[in-house]
Structure formats: structure tokens, C-alpha cells
């Protein structure tokens, strides 16, 4: 290399040093000063990892005095370059010696980097191109946002999430029966709204007891990092912002907290949200004359927030007025009058009955035919297909079909059987004595509920006298029984749930010390990470725990359907909690009958509660939609019976009779009131199954796995294969970046297999929607990784020394989240020969790539320097060809956008004529969006993203 004092060079290995200046040439050594950092580097002249900086005619260059010039001529004198041209600010002619170039010049354009010798590995060029292709495909994919959740592919959930998640500012009521996954549906909708850019700020309002469950569900299932806001958090956040709720984008808050703290509620109102989610919305009490404070708060928020999701118990359970109150929150203009709503419901009831006949395939009665004809013009009942089309139209025109989704177990397949096993046991003398002493000492006070709860858990009474020691496990017959059950079913996974964390801890110790049974605990005193580890240990097939012992609160939000044995060591006083316990195993996807084991102590409140649940409500072997209203109706009598703790059979029998008299007619009424039309609409039918099939095919796509592993390799992320479809990722010592997006410093265990992720809470499910994959692609495309490369092509059919230039352009418009589904950044690949002909369409990337051999940076730089004028010319010709191709891409995007949005607009306008639930704001939004996207698509620009220079060789 001919070095001369004053020349400008750039380091190949330390590009952040900026431009270097040769300050000494002595013997075999050369010294460069890098003025931007003040550092010196001494190199051996023959092997110096530096590249000469030279610019070409037409380039714009910056000077050390912060003005720029356009180069018109390049001269050389005594080994130094002189750039002749004009200043860009005043058109003054100038001649600039290279020593006066800016010290901070960076080569961001791929052609500048190529000519400056900043040549990357060929494998990184390939990775960059694949990142562009995959990003483009993913943003066009209509299922984007659905595949990324750690959820089973359940048709009705996917359909609701897809249907609602694609709307602008969705305002809907999710009213699926318990166990059908309303929380998952809401999570998928939130995930899609955030990924598509339709929403940025989300507020979830919940009862305090559900906050942690939602926090875990959103994080573990959807990688959404919500923040819990209470008074302490608000005080902390006040240091960063006047309104603490503006310090986070995703917030979970207790409705009760806001009700008690008026100032905090005012701050929540002042913060701007895109989506409001309210769980347990049926607890928002409302009457025409006296709405509750909680209802008024949600109403005030719903008036300001564009999107609203209300999660509620099934409408039928709570009466029409309560149902109307929630619909009124979603659209007060549409649901303005309760009496009018009742009249409309009654009229719709006749339509639903007629639709029932249509669905059953029977000959339509005259009344049904007349009703359907009034709803559907040109009614054709000639065959099954015509009937199905008629049903589809009715679904679209359904009275509340756009705002209400409700599925029941009766119309959803895939749930397991439930079988109850009961084990009566004698009350130990130690408990009898403890109860007697408690009574003598006046410890039997408190309200009815407190006394009832006390007798349900006699071990707690005993421990009041014993202290910290848990010797109750030595004489309680339920412990011996549990040991025998576990020993007799060594190969079975068993989930044990009890009310208190202390009970779970004591049981685990007893099982371990007495019989060496492998178990683990799971309770609210553990961190999320500790719970993940416990869950993973339980899920592990070889060498894992046989039994997982959960507390009531600790088990919230977790599902263990790989187990089929459930032990209810004690019973909760609330029927909703009982269903929640059973729901840990009774999920869609459970392969076996759920065996429910209930031990109880005879002659105690435990026996009475077990019989009330089973003989009164049949709540163990069936889901019980009537449980809540029946429980409220007999609450005081039940509590009195339990608080007496006498085993009074006469009183118990009377209570069971009353319970059944309430339960059975209500259950029959709910069944008769089922809205088949609404259920078919909510379940999605064939459309839902198509979604499942599409997502299952995406799960089986090995291309994503291949790309991910290649990306981790190139960036420098360590990968350790742990078997069982598991891979441990940790930051490498020599990564291209200081940290990889979404990868903690202590690493992460990932899997690409959905069933594995569903059974292992300690593993992340990697998909195209996962933050690590999206962040990794953004990292590559937002940097210069792989932007330049040089390779050799061994091909004796071509003249030796022939050159090819591979140009990767990207056609993109201004960033707009709604634009991506029509015009995402689109790669355009050209393969130019020396004559400027584009061979890209004839020579596929993958096949061509396999024929190439990489070269090192120094040889690559020499090859580029020798062909620099030719490369300049080919880039110019390629730009012209790419512009022509871009025009075609823009035309297709414009047509696709216009057709899609016009179809949506036409459908909604037609629907509005027969269904008032279509909001004017939706129509206005689509019209405005159409005009805005049309303008943005027309503004699409072309940029050169990557270059690969190829030289033909015969060796």
C-alpha cells in the first residue's frame, strides 16, 4: 500500500473511529491519527486493516468546517487527492485537499461503504436479503399478530380475535362462557392492535384479585409488558411526569383503586388511551335512575377512548337490564333507551327462531318463511348451500352481531369429560380438641362468612395453637390418603390445589420427607421466574415433579392440561373459584377425562360444602352457569350451615332441595334462551377452521427456524441445544451489538414448537411475531449489517474476470401502520451484467447464492477498486430499471388497497342499512384512510439497500 502524509484512510475493524490521517510513515510501519476520537493507531504497512477514502464525481462531501461540496473533478498530487467542485450552500467554486475532509464522515450508503472498503461477509448479505423478504411477507400476512401468542390454535378464539383485532377502534362485548378463553381472546386482540399500529396505549381495568393473573397472562402468552399501577407506583412515576399514567404505554389498574382515589381517576381520564379493556364488566352495577360509581367511571373513559373491550359473564345469566347497560357503554347512541332495546330484542327473537328452523334443515313454517323473507331479499331455500348463504347474511345483519360475541360449551367441541371421586374421612381428635378449645376461648367470633371459612380449614385452627410447626400433616387423614394416591399412580402427573400457600408448602414437605415423592410448590409468595421454574419442573416428562401443589391465588392464569388428575385438598367457598380450579385442567386440548379427587372430613363444613356443590349444583362434573346467581340467592343459609359445623343433615337436605329448585329451572331457561344464530356467528364456523389450518401450516414452516438460527449465528448469540425442542440463547462475547433485542443478559430458553411452549412456561415460543424476531430483523435492516459483499463465481462458461453486480433496492413509503398490509417495504433484486442487462428474474437468489465463494475484505476491496468506474455505471443503470419495477409495485399496491378498503366500505354501508350497530365513525375512518393511503402509496421512494459485487473465476 503506498502511504503518504496527509492521506485519509478508514479503519476496517474500528469504523467508529471516523476518518484517519496518515501522520507518520517510517520503515515498515505507518501511523494514523483519528481526530474524531484523538486516538492513534500504528500498523504494519503490508497488513494494515485500513481502506483509502476516495470520492467520485457527483458525490457530496463534508468538510471539517461543516460545509459541503459537490465533486466535479478529482485530481491527484504527490499521492494526495484534491476534490474540485462547488459548495452546496452558495455555489462557490472550491478545491478541497483531502486532509480537510470532515473527521466524522460515515459511509451509510451501500455504494459508499463498498468503495470505502467496508465490505461485510457474504453470509450477512444473504441474511440481510432474507430479512427484507421475510419482513415483507409478514407485513402482508393477514394473520399477523395471531401466530405469536403462546396459545393453542382454538377456532372460536382465533376467529373472534381476527374479526375484532382487524377493526379500527373495536368496541365489543366478549361474553363467552367460563373456560372458553375470554382473556386469551382479549390478549390476541390487544396483540394485533399493537402490532398493526392501530393502538399504542392500552389500559386494562380489573378487580384487584385479577391484576396479577392478567399481568402473567399478557407477559407469558403475548410478550406484552404491562405495568401494574397502584398508589405507590403513581408516587414513583410522579418524578418522571406530572401525570403518572403517561409514563407507561401498557397499564393494568384496579377499578376499586381508581374509585377510592378521585385524583388518580382524573389523571387516567386526562391520559390519552387507544384501547380500554374492562374485565368482570358484569359487576358494573347500573339502573336507569342510579348507576354505580364504578359504572360511571367506565362510562366516562368509554366516551373518550376509541376502542373498548368489555369482558363479561354470559348475558343470559344477569338479565336484560344488566346486558343493556354494558351495550350502552359501547355505543350510547345506538343503545339509548331500555324499552326500545327490549322491543328490538323481542322482534329479533322471532328472527332467531326462524333461523333455528333454517339451521336445523327442516321444512320452513309459513311464519318462519315470512319472517326470513322480510329480512332477506330474494330468499332461496332450494338447497343446503342456499340455506347456508341465507344464514350467513342473517349473521351479518344480526341485531348485536357486530358488538357481541358469545360462545357456550354446548356449541364448542373439544372439552374433556369430568369425573368426581370423593373420599370421606374421620375428623381427627386433634382437630376436635382444637375446635373445642377455640370455642371456649371465644375465638369463634366474626361474621357468618369468616366463621364458615374457619371451619372449612381445620388445620388453620390447629396451627393457631401449635404455632409455626406443621405437625397437622402427621395426623390429618387427607395427607395419608394423598400419599397413597401418588404412590399408586407413579406415572401420573397430579395437580393439588389448596386455599393457602402455607398448606401447599407443608404438604410438599410431608410428601418429600415421608415417601421421597418429587413435588414442587406454586404460590403467590414466589416470583414469576420461580413459578416458571416450578411449572417447568412439573411439566418435565423425564425426572420432573410428579405433583404440583398450588395455592388458590398462585394457580391463577396457569393451565396444566398435560395432567388429568386434580386433587382439591380443600374447597373454596366461592363457586367461581371452584370452576377456576377445575379449569386448570379442563381445557380444550385436554386428552383425558379430568379425574377430580375430593377428600373431606365427615361431620364438618367440608362435607356440607362438597354435597352442596355436587348434589345442589352438579358443579364438579359440569360447568355451572347458574352457580353465581344461585350462590347469591342461598348465600346466608349456606354460610349459616357451614358456620354451625355440626353436620346437621336435616338443614343440609333442605338447602340442597332449595338449591336444586333454583338451579334446574334457571339452567333450563338458559338452555332454551341460547341464541344459535349468535353462537354460530361467534364460533366462526368454516372461517375459523381456515384460520387454524393457516396458522398450523405457519407453525410447520421450517423457513422461520432456519432464518432465526442463521440470524443468531451471524449476530453472535450463543445457542445451546438442550433437547426436548429447547434451545438456550445467551449473549455472546463478540456480538455485533452490545445487546440483542428481547434477550436478557442471563439468557432465555426458547422453542419453535407450540405444544412444547404450551406445556413449559419457562420457554418462550419463537415465531415471526415474537419481539426477538421482530427486533432482530429491525436490528439488521436498521444497521449496515450485510449491506455490502464481494464474492467469486466459479463458472467456466463465462469469461474469466467477468463481473456481475447484485443490487437490492427497497421501495418504501412513509411509515404508517395501516400502509404495511398494502405497501410494506418491498425488496427489488437486480443482477446486472457488465452490459447493464438485468438477469435477476432469470437467476433465482438461492440457486445463485449457492454457486458463490466468499472472499476476504482486503481482496474484495482490491477487486472493487479495480472496477470502480464500471460499478458506478451499473448502479446508475440499475436505478433506472428499479424505478420501472417500482412503478408496477406501486400500481399493484394502490389497486390492492382500493379494492380491499372499498369492499370493506361497501359492506359496512350495506350493513348499516339493516344493522344500526355500524358506527358512522367506522365509515368515516375508512374513507379518510383510503384517501391518506392513496397519497402515501404515490409517495413511494426507492433506496439502494445492499450491493454484492461478483467476479467470475475458473479456479
Swiss-Prot record:
Motif (DEAH box): 279-282
EC number(s) recorded for this UniProt protein: 3.6.4.-
Pfam family, one: SNF2-rel_dom
Keyword Nucleotide-binding (UniProt): yes
Coiled coil (UniProt feature): none
Recorded superkingdom: Bacteria
Keyword field: Activator, ATP-binding, DNA-binding, Helicase, Hydrolase, Nucleotide-binding, Transcription, Transcription regulation
Residues involved in ATP binding: 176-183
Residue ranges occupied by any Helicase C-terminal domain in the UniProt entry: 478-642
A GO molecular function held by the record: DNA binding
Enzyme class: hydrolase
InterPro entries registered for this protein in UniProt: Helicase_ATP-bd (IPR014001), Helicase_C-like (IPR001650), Helicase_RapA (IPR023949), P-loop_NTPase (IPR027417), RapA_C (IPR022737), SNF2-like_sf (IPR038718), SNF2/RAD54-like_C (IPR049730), SNF2_N (IPR000330)
Family the UniProt entry places it in: Belongs to the SNF2/RAD54 helicase family. RapA subfamily.
Subunit structure: Interacts with the RNAP. Has a higher affinity for the core RNAP than for the holoenzyme. Its ATPase activity is stimulated by binding to RNAP.
NCBIfam families: PRK04914.1
Designated name of the protein: RNA polymerase-associated protein RapA
Species annotation: Aeromonas salmonicida (strain A449)
Primary gene name: rapA
